């Protein structure tokens, strides 16, 4: 069966003929609506149901005035016909009736059936009633019922008794807005059944016999209405004239009212430290070193509580220790020194994230709750404040201008109207005022206004020709009639404008109309595209004709074929417009359409020069907003952009805030449809027990994690066995995402599965908030699951939830409500959500959507928090201005410009006193450390800004402000790394990850946290000379120089061991590229971390077609050299591989979470994350389909591949050479690279240095004892020449300072010179360490005294054990043997202590033989590892078709080429399966 698109068969026929009898012929036999299956990837080619016939009949209560023939008119537009005086009617109007075909559909969209009205002849209104809405829990929505406002009741009591039939124009400020008087969807209010058929009359063609009396309106409302004349009245609606916006305002107000200012649980005004579930495996035996500061006490108290200690118990112990037993712990709280962050009393210490990361001494401050500042709390007077969205949105000033202009123009129009009625002269003044009114209303000129203006001009022209002297009709009477029609047309245009766009006014009395529809009518989607208004004059000259296309989409997929419509040239009336007036008939039953269907219309111009069709603008709209279809005429802003985002066509793109330069008018039918939920099919009693193979196949398919990675065939298989899927073998997003379409039956089954599903964890529901699931019921269930997360847990996923708002059907959705609720409960959530929304405002298509949500957030936050938001925003604005001025300055002037502009920040803090840091709301700043601010010489010229901490117990805070770089991608990568680190911590694995904060504060700008005591690997390489990147010992030597004590060195080695493994795993999974020594950082405590994530997901830079990043991740031989302590502890490399593989396998178990987080960001506009191929890249790196053994083998190969990748070293060498040539000696070190300014730490200071003795060798070494600031001591040896070299360096670096005199050799007598130098050098060191803080803490002084320690040096210290200890030196091999079905798998992991007969290291490989089978048939072999006594393999050996283990022996032989090294025979029947085990090797020479 094929669909037939029916339009006017002859558009050139006269206008009168288009109202004659029309017939739609059936293409084929009727088809049951229940058989309609609506898919996504096929063109609709079948029709369902019958298309009825039109018949004509006369209705005495309606009127038509036929208009002149029009060549391009094929349908009805807004108020198509003239409307005559309100008390004059004609009997020539036509009535359209439908033959009843079938009963009302029980599913989908039902026709709006209205009760019979009373006194329907008293008024006719365009308003829409608001029926009773029972919410999402009802089985269906109720039938729309008429609703009368106070204005309606007055209208019904009035009769026209005055001869003046003009409307009254006024502005009402005190009448509360009522939804029924400004509905945006024009729902019909009344019905009238007559003799077996139903009347259907276009609202633009019908007025009833009643209306209001202007005089009585004035007498009734004269106290509340600003009277302007005798025409029209406007009422103020602060919540907007649009019902959707007004409803959203009411919803936000109700949410806010649930959280009273007096509720200290949710309105403490404090920033609580974030917590997680207590990591038992990590902190089972951990104790924290805590210093407690108490008011009126100079010395802190020292406690060492266990990690599982409750905060309130610690407070009780502190109070008991202070002999204040009368004080209650509940009245006290602990704050973190240096910040405004407070611990949560009901949580364990170890649950707080700050304790999980900070392993040093933690300083806390005990405060009384009532004395702790709650400055961010909401005040009592805010509980009853009203939410008017237009008071917070940017375009509020546009509304005011529009309203004020409209009122002014109406006054002028009224003045000229009175003058015209009195004198019948100066009609052109009237026409000019009408043009101005249309201009204010988006430059929209309706047909009714055009016809009235033309007729008015014609009357006065004929009057001048004495045309009416012989006529019974007076010119004055005709003028009154036409001006009434003109006023009515203006009135209706104002009403349509107010319902189409956001406005804070609307007409007081909207004329109502009635429409009728047989509920059994199988109606198809149909509407009229009338015109595109206000065509730019440049288009008029460039294009000879204009056309449009339209289509329907659902979930980013087209539901039907795109149709092109006829080309029409523009015309000039008041403004340029293109008038198609073309009726569009979709061959789709409305009830078969998905509820979340979107209509998209494109405007094309036919170029005069090339005759090509160029896309000029587009718009989109939901077909069924608020569960009901759109009724009547609507205006739509057209977006002047290249292409609509097909995948993101959602209501969020539909911007109704204000008219755009080009406005599209669409006339929808007067009859509406209302959505009814499908009945769920609960019967599953006939299901058979699934086959075992079927369940296994479902589990294999579930490894795809997201429907986007499933092929159509696999989707069909999964959907076929959908009722066998559960949370043990599959995920709900995969099952629902495999549905073949969104027809009524499929939706019913999806909802059935949805209700029956048991979620394994709340985060599984994240996959239901992607763009693949627009269904509101599915998204509602997803939010219900996420509501089980705590505020601190939800905080981690806010970026994805903000993106998910794009695909919500309206701003009253459960997801938006969840975000607002949590922002009221947590300042942390509110603060992060604020900056995410501020950043999202820069997204082109969803700016208005996010603006409204941001306004709602600010209303909920309260005045105090909003004041902080304003200060933070102002701070960012000043930083942006400073950055721009520094960039625009020349190289030699930049430092001067920066110093001058920093003064603006000082003025800022003089005005605001304090301000919270956007990066971290718990940090409050009060000023600028002027001398510590600088800029960096990288391409973006970022600023280093050091703020003064407002907390007297805190240190200064340094941040980097970047302008010119898009930091959103950095935010995403760091968020995903934080998620992985949290997973590791919960599994008991602390990878010592440093994850710095990063915040995008606007388009291509943002803040980056500076990590103290960190330096780039490139700088370490530069200190090692020209070929530093090629040396093996560079990193080891650097750590040795900065960790002289054995304990410090071991700690640094352990930190590097774990952090290097962690960053290897995360950078591999995320495919982080552009890795070189300039974006790898090291701290002196051993932590390694990466920065700058502009390239990820494998999008490597290329040079000459060759990728610059050719290693899976950065793990170089110099890193291995440090881990193995120069090769002395080769088993450390095995431990490193084990750690990496363990961390990798832990993350693989959470593949679904990572892929869901990435999928939810697909449409965030990130350059590196834009398609399914990017998700597939991460999927391929995670390998969720692999076993742990397979994944271990895979990642080990990647480690070896990275270790052997020489281009990495070459790339580091190139960057080092480039940096050495770029850095000018005149520039300070802190300006060469952002992180290098953190090289010096105030904690690395020296108290004193004393020479203990000297040795009379050729070099005359002096033994020096160095006392550190923490009272620790170390020893170092220096020669007299080294002292002299130090003095020369200080003279060059501090030429402006007066340095102590150095005891040169010529100052000393020839006798007893050694003892004299002993004394003089001690005196010299004492002076140097006291000359100034700048000299004492300089690089050269610190490196002189803290390098080359002789006590417990790294070379002399005992080995550091990082993994499993092996006291013996016997050779052994580690295996993991598994057996499933008939498959035997052996993972060869490591070997230890293997040697050749001469004692040298072998290049060993392993051979396997499965006995008693012939050796050649069952022989397997691994690759060889060259020259290693402790080799690592992690290779898998597989034997298939092993029916049983009993009677089989595995022979393992280790060889170095052909030389025998060792062997063992393993009886498989006694082997512990799936466990790691070390097996001894026999016959090897030790």
Curated annotation (Swiss-Prot):
Entry-linked Pfam families: C2, PI3_PI4_kinase, PI3K_C2, PI3K_rbd, PI3Ka, PX
Domain PIK helical: 684-860
Example GO biological process: phosphatidylinositol 3-kinase/protein kinase B signal transduction
Region (Catalytic loop): 1071-1079
Region span, Activation loop: 1090-1116
GO cellular component, one term: membrane
Summary of the tissues where the protein is detected: Highly expressed in liver, prostate and testis. Lower levels in small intestine, kidney and pancreas.
Ranges where the PX domain occurs: 1240-1352
Keywords assigned by UniProt, alphabetized: ATP-binding, Chemotaxis, Kinase, Lipid metabolism, Membrane, Nucleotide-binding, Transferase
Alphabetical list of InterPro entries matching this protein: ARM-type_fold (IPR016024), C2_dom (IPR000008), C2_domain_sf (IPR035892), Kinase-like_dom_sf (IPR011009), PI3/4_kinase_cat_dom (IPR000403), PI3/4_kinase_cat_sf (IPR036940), PI3/4_kinase_CS (IPR018936), PI3K-C2-gamma_dom (IPR037707)
Protein localization: Membrane
Disulfide bond residue pairs: none
Record-stated family: Belongs to the PI3/PI4-kinase family.
Annotated protein name in UniProt: Phosphatidylinositol 3-kinase C2 domain-containing subunit gamma
Organism expressing this protein natively: Homo sapiens
Gene name as annotated: PIK3C2G
């Amino acid at each position: 069966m094929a669909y037939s698109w029916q339009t006017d068969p002859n558009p050139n026929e006269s206008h009168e003929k288009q109202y004659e009898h029309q017939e739609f012929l059936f293409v084929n036999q009727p088809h049951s609506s229940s058989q309609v299956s609506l898919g996504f990837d096929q063109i609709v080619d079948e029709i369902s149901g019958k298309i009825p016939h039109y018949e004509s009949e006369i209705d005495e209560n309606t009127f038509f005035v036929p208009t002149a023939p029009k060549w391009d008119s094929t349908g009805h537009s807004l108020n198509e016909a003239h409307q005559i005086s309100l008390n004059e009617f004609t009997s020539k109007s036509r009535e359209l009736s439908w033959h009843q075909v079938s009963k009302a559909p029980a599913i989908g969209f039902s026709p709006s059936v209205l009760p019979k009205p009373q006194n329907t002849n008293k008024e006719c209104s365009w308003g829409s009633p608001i029926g009773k809405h029972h919410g999402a829990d009802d089985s269906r929505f109720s039938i729309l019922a008429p609703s009368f406002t106070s204005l309606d009741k007055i209208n019904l009591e009035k009769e026209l008794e005055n001869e003046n039939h003009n409307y009254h124009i006024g502005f009402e400020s005190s009448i509360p807005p009522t939804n029924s008087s400004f509905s945006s969807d024009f729902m019909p209010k009344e019905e009238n059944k007559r003799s077996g058929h139903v009347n259907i009359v276009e609202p633009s063609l019908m007025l009833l016999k009643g209306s209001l009396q202007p005089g009585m309106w004035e007498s009734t409302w004269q106290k509340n209405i600003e009277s302007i004349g005798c025409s029209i009245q406007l009422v103020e609606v602060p919540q907007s004239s649009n019902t959707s916006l007004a409803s959203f305002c009411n919803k936000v107000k109700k949410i806010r009212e649930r959280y009273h200012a007096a509720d200290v649980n949710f309105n403490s005004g404090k920033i609580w430290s974030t917590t997680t579930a207590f990591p038992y495996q990590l902190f089972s035996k951990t104790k924290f070193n805590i210093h407690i500061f108490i008011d009126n006490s100079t010395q802190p108290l020292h406690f060492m509580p266990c990690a599982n200690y409750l905060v309130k118990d610690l407070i009780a112990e502190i109070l008991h220790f202070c002999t204040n037993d009368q004080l209650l712990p509940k009245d006290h709280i602990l704050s973190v020194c240096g910040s405004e962050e407070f611990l949560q009393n009901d949580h364990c210490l170890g649950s707080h994230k700050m304790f999980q990361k900070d392993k040093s001494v933690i300083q806390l401050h005990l405060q009384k709750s009532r004395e702790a500042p709650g400055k961010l709390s909401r005040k009592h007077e805010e509980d009853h404040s009203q939410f008017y969205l237009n008071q917070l949105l940017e375009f509020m000033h546009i509304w005011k201008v529009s309203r004020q202009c409209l009122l002014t123009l109406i006054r002028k129009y009224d003045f000229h109207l009175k003058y015209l009625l009195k004198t019948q002269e100066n009609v052109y003044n009237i026409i000019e005022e009408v043009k101005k009114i249309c201009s204010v209303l988006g430059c929209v000129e309706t047909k009714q206004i055009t016809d009235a203006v033309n007729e008015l001009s014609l009357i006065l022209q004929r009057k001048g020709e004495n045309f009416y002297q012989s006529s019974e009709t007076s010119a004055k009477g005709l003028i009154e009639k036409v001006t009434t029609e003109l006023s009515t047309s203006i009135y209706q245009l104002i009403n349509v404008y107010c319902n189409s766009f956001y406005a804070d006014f609307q007409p007081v009395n909207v004329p109502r109309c009635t429409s009728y529809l047989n509920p059994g009518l199988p109606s198809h989607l149909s509407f009229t595209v009338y015109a595109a208004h206000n065509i730019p004059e440049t288009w008029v000259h460039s294009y000879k004709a204009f056309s449009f296309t339209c289509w329907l989409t659902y979930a980013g997929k087209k539901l039907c074929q795109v149709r092109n419509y006829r080309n029409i040239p523009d015309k000039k009336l008041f403004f340029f417009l293109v008038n198609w007036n073309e009726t569009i008939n979709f061959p789709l039953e409305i009830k078969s359409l998905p509820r979340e269907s979107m209509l998209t219309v494109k405007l094309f111009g036919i170029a005069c020069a090339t005759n090509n069709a160029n896309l000029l603008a587009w718009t989109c709209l939901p077909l069924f907003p608020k569960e009901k279809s759109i009724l009547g005429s609507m205006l739509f802003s057209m977006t002047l952009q290249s292409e609509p985002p097909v995948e993101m066509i959602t209501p969020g793109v539909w911007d109704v805030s204000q008219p755009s330069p080009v406005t599209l008018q669409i006339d929808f039918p007067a009859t509406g449809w209302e959505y009814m939920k499908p009945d769920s099919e609960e019967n599953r009693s006939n299901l058979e027990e699934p086959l075992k193979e079927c369940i296994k196949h479902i589990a294999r398919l579930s490894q795809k994690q997201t429907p986007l990675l499933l092929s159509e065939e696999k989707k069909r298989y999964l959907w076929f066995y959908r009722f066998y899927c559960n949370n043990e073998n599959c995920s709900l997003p995969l099952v629902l995402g495999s549905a073949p379409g969104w027809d009524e039956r499929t939706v019913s089954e999806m909802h059935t599965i949805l209700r029956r599903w048991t979620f394994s964890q709340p985060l599984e529901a994240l996959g239901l908030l992607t763009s693949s699931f627009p269904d509101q019921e599915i998204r509602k269930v997803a939010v219900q699951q996420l509501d089980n997360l705590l505020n601190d847990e939800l905080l981690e996923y806010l970026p994805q939830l903000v993106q998910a708002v794009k695909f919500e059907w309206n701003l009253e959705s459960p997801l938006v409500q969840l975000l607002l609720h949590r922002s009221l409960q947590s300042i942390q959530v509110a603060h992060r959500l604020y900056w995410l929304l501020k950043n999202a405002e820069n997204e082109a298509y969803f700016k208005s959507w996010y603006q409204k949500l941001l306004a709602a957030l600010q209303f909920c936050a309260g005045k105090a928090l909003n004041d902080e938001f304003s200060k933070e925003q102002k701070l960012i604005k000043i930083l942006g201005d400073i950055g721009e001025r520094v960039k625009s300055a020349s190289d030699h002037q930049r430092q001067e410009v920066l110093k001058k502009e920093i003064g603006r920040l000082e003025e800022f803090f003089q005005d605001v006193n304090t301000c919270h840091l956007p990066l971290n709301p718990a940090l409050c700043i009060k000023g600028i450390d002027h001398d510590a601010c600088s800029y960096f010489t990288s391409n973006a010229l970022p600023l280093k800004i050091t703020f003064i901490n407002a907390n007297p117990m805190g240190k200064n805070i340094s941040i980097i402000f970047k302008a010119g770089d898009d930091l959103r991608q950095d935010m995403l990568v760091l968020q995903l790394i934080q998620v992985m680190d949290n997973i590791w911590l919960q599994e008991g694995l602390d990878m010592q990850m440093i994850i710095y904060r990063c915040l995008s504060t606007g388009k291509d700008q943002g803040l980056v946290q500076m990590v103290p005591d960190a330096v780039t690997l490139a700088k370490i390489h530069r200190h090692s000379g020209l070929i530093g990147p090629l040396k093996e010992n560079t990193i080891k030597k650097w750590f040795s120089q900065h960790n002289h004590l054995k304990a410090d060195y071991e700690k640094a080695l352990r930190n590097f061991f774990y952090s290097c493994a962690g960053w290897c795993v995360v950078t591999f999974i995320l495919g982080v590229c552009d890795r070189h020594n300039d974006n790898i950082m090291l701290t002196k405590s051993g932590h390694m971390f990466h920065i700058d994530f502009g390239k990820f997901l494998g999008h490597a830079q290329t040079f000459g077609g060759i990728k610059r990043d050719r290693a899976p991740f950065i793990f170089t031989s110099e890193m291995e050299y440090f881990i193995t302590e120069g090769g002395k502890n080769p088993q450390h490399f095995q431990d490193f591989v084990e750690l990496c593989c363990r961390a990798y396998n832990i993350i693989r178990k959470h593949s679904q979470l990572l892929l869901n987080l990435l999928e939810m960001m697909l449409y965030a506009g990130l350059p590196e994350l834009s398609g399914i191929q990017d998700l597939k890249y991460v999927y391929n790196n995670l390998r969720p389909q692999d076993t742990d053994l397979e994944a271990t083998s895979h990642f080990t190969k990647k480690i070896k591949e990275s270790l052997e990748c020489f281009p990495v070293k070459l790339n580091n060498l190139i960057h080092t050479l480039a940096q050495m040539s770029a850095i000018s000696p005149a520039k300070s070190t802190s300006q060469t690279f952002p992180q290098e300014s953190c090289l010096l730490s105030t904690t690395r200071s020296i108290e004193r240095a004393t020479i203990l003795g000297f040795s009379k060798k050729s070099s005359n070494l002096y033994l020096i004892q160095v006392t550190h600031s923490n009272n620790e001591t170390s020893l170092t040896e220096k020669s007299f020449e080294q002292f002299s070299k130090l003095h020369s360096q200080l003279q060059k670096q501090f030429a402006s300072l007066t340095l102590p005199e150095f005891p040169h050799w010529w100052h000393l007598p020839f006798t007893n010179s050694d003892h004299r130098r002993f004394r003089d050098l001690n005196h010299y060191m004492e002076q140097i360490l006291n000359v100034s803080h700048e000299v004492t803490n300089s690089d050269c002084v610190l490196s002189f005294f803290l390098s080359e320690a002789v006590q417990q040096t790294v070379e002399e210290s005992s080995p550091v054990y990082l993994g499993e200890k092996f006291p013996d030196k016997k050779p052994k091999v580690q295996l993991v043997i598994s057996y499933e079905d008939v498959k035997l798998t052996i993972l060869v992991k490591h070997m230890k202590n293997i040697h050749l007969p001469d004692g040298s290291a072998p290049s060993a490989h392993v051979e396997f033989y499965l006995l008693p089978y012939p050796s050649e048939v069952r022989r397997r072999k691994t690759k060889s590892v060259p020259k290693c006594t402790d080799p690592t393999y992690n290779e898998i050996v597989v034997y298939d078709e092993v029916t049983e283990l009993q009677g089989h022996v595995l022979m393992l032989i280790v060889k170095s080429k052909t030389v025998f090294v060792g062997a063992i025979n393993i009886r498989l029947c006694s082997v512990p399966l799936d466990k790691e085990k070390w097996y001894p090797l026999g016959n090897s020479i030790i």
